[in-house]
Design a protein with these regions (language model features):
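Gly-rich Lys/Arg/Thr-decorated short loops/hinges at beta-loop-alpha junctions or inter-strand turns
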Residues: 1-2
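Active-site-proximal beta-alpha core segment in soluble small-molecule metabolic enzymes
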Residues: 5-9, 13, 30-156
Length: 156
């Protein structure tokens, strides 16, 4: 026996909700970075990225493979570290922002010259390295634009 579930989205209401959140984040001095990875939560990653492009200039994707089909005006942050630099960006594009979380990631991207976020380790010890990785990445010719961290779970 199979069960079919049908989900209907009131698109105008949903987009209005997303716009309110994006505006609230902007007013608070932040910048919204939607995560559009995997299958796009059933909507399709490229469709969600196109919607996100109406509200922001940066999206996060899970892997390098998820860069295909993103709107040209979006900057993509790749959350999963890679051991190979991407191909040269299209004309007028600055290319994706990659994540590095270990010396091996830095070594693999050395002299690539692109932008990176350094993933720092948290008390959870889930991923990342210590704060010295920021300087290691810079010395390897990478342009460090920020750091990321997995916050600890409450009570840890």
């Amino acid at each position: 026996m199979s069960v079919t579930i049908r989900l209907t989205i009131r698109t105008a209401v949903w987009r209005s909700h997303v716009a309110r959140i994006a505006n609230a984040v902007d007013e608070a001095g932040g910048g919204l970075v939607p995560v559009v990875k995997g299958n796009g939560y059933g909507f399709g990653r490229n469709w969600l990225a196109a919607v996100a492009a109406d509200f922001c200039d940066t999206v996060a994707v899970g892997t390098m493979h998820e860069l295909d089909g993103l709107p040209d005006q979006l900057t993509a942050v790749v959350l999963t570290p890679t051991l190979s630099p991407p191909e040269a960006p299209a004309s007028g594009s600055s290319g994706p922002v990659l994540t590095v979380g270990s010396q091996a990631h830095i070594d693999a991207l050395a002299n690539w010259g692109g932008r990176v976020i350094v993933k720092l380790v948290s008390p959870m010890r889930r991923f990342g390295g210590d704060h010295e990785m920021v300087q290691l990445a810079k010395r390897a010719g990478l342009h460090v634009v920020g750091v990321s961290i997995h916050p600890p779970i409450a009570g840890s």
